Amino acid sequence: MKVGTTEEDIGTEASRNLRKGFATLFAVYRNLANDSYYGDAANVIEYSISNCSWAAPQPTDDGYEIAYSVDVDGNPIYTADMTDEERFDAALQASIGFFKAAGYTWDEATQTFTAAPEGAKMSYEVICPANGGEDHPAYLLCEYVRQALEKIGITLVINNPSDSNVIWNALEANTEEMWCAAWSATLDPDMYQTWHSKNVVGAPGSTGSNHAYLIDEQLDQLIMDARTSSDQEYRKAIYKECLDIIKDWGVEVPYYQRQEMYVVSAERVNVDTITPDVTPYWNWMNDIQNMEMN
């Protein structure tokens, strides 16, 4: 998604503002959609990294912020005492600001956008493979955003295929505009495969994992710098810079992280011998030699 007609236009300020206009609305409805679908079985995350990783920014860290929570001028969109409805309205107003900055034509009389700048559109598609129904964590999120955008004259078409191959074929052909999918992460938070420009889909020798087509020299250098050290504090600081760059491009809205669940019989297993404080990277199977049966 970009404003302009060349491939290089994907990185312009106007193109970033276009994407942030959508991202701001997707971000504000995440808690509502997640609570409806997962409840306590998943938590909303604010950065494009596993929240269980040692490199994940934490609320107590300097510079930590809620995803897409500032307006086009860099001011906070929300206050702590806002109700949900006030937050939704504030996000919509911030979204309007981003679209205006992207070059969209705003009609004060109707309070809607009436025309898109060259290279952008009044209607965009998001692929959310919910098997033709609503059984997908992001389906309700997309619907909330669709309804919000409709108020300001922009159309979001939810492509809800029954065949999930539709999304993968679109990604392979580079025909997608927005899409919803889950991803898994390895123990080491190295970002080379997903975010380095050498792995943009179609590039020679590419892993094909950079579906955002994000080409940023500073990001590339930071990713490589982080690979030169085993110092976790150093790498965490570098990855925070990377995550902020990714957010500034407006190419991904982090949504949720599922909770791991295990069911055991206390009649059969001595639960005191089960691994305490399991994580996605270290669970009961890693300490199975310590487990005892009753």
Where are the model-predicted features located?
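A generic secondary-structure signal for well-formed alpha-helical elements
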Residues: 25-39, 102-103, 152-156, 183, ...
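Active-site-proximal beta-strand/loop segments in catalytic clefts of secreted hydrolases
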Residues: 25, 35, 50, 129, ...
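Short amphipathic alpha-helical coiled-coil/interface segments
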Residues: 223-227, 232-247
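Append "and occasionally in soluble cytosolic enzymes with long acidic Gly/Pro-rich linkers
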Residues: 11-147, 241, 289-292
